[in-house]
Amino acid sequence: MAKQITSNCNFIFGASDIKSLPNESAPEIAFAGRSNVGKSSLINLLINSKKAARVSSKPGCTRQINFYSMYDDKFRLVDLPGYGYSHAGKEEIIQYLNLIEYYLIQRENLRRVFVLIDSKVGLKEIDKDFIYWLIYNNINFNIVLTKIDKVSQKSLGAVIEDIQKWINNENVSIHQMSIRVKHKITKVRDEFFKFTR
């Protein structure tokens, strides 16, 4: 049976530089992906909340690492700034990319990174670059395909096959997510909970 998460989630802090990162006292699960791929929506679905993580219709709005505490800080959800499109200037983009890199490499309490891929477009070069970087730095990750209700089963199957062939690693799980397909959310939630212990 899937473990249920209710609304016991609190926003801790938005870190905009390395010095402002919170302590490492709890296990953390991070969510990464292109701008507007659905990271905040997935976080809200996982914790059964409509507004814990801010969802924006404008891509590239998240420019800090947002930390959410679950169950009195037994574990945390971490919403990383989207890579790709951004309204920020060049210097600001470099600053938060350096922040993301530092967080992913140096954070000792990071348990897993969930990389979100838009199933409507599949793997883009920027996704591949990010995944290559994770592999190079020995950072464990899973893939979550978002917006699966927007594509046909045939197209979805082709996207999954393409990712499996490209990654060629049986230790990397590929999950599917849609706000309209509840059993898919449950499977992602079950996988998510494996890394919170």
UniProtKB/Swiss-Prot annotation:
Superkingdom of the organism of origin: Bacteria
Names of the cofactor(s): Mg(2+)
Binding site for Mg(2+): 40, 62
Domain EngB-type G, residue spans: 25-197
BP-aspect Gene Ontology terms: division septum assembly
Matching PROSITE patterns: G_ENGB
Binding-site residues for GTP, renumbered to this chain: 33-40, 60-64, 79-82, 146-149, 177-179
Pfam family of the protein (one): MMR_HSR1
Keyword Metal-binding: yes
SUPFAM superfamilies: P-loop containing nucleoside triphosphate hydrolases
Keywords in alphabetical order: Cell cycle, Cell division, GTP-binding, Magnesium, Metal-binding, Nucleotide-binding, Septation
Transmembrane annotation, as ranges: none
Molecular function terms from GO: GTP binding; metal ion binding
InterPro entries: G_ENGB_dom, GTP-bd, GTP-bd_ribosome_bio_YsxC, P-loop_NTPase
NCBIfam families assigned: GTPase_YsxC
Function description: Necessary for normal cell division and for the maintenance of normal septation.
Family recorded in the similarity comment: Belongs to the TRAFAC class TrmE-Era-EngA-EngB-Septin-like GTPase superfamily. EngB GTPase family.
Protein's recorded name: Probable GTP-binding protein EngB
Gene behind this protein: engB
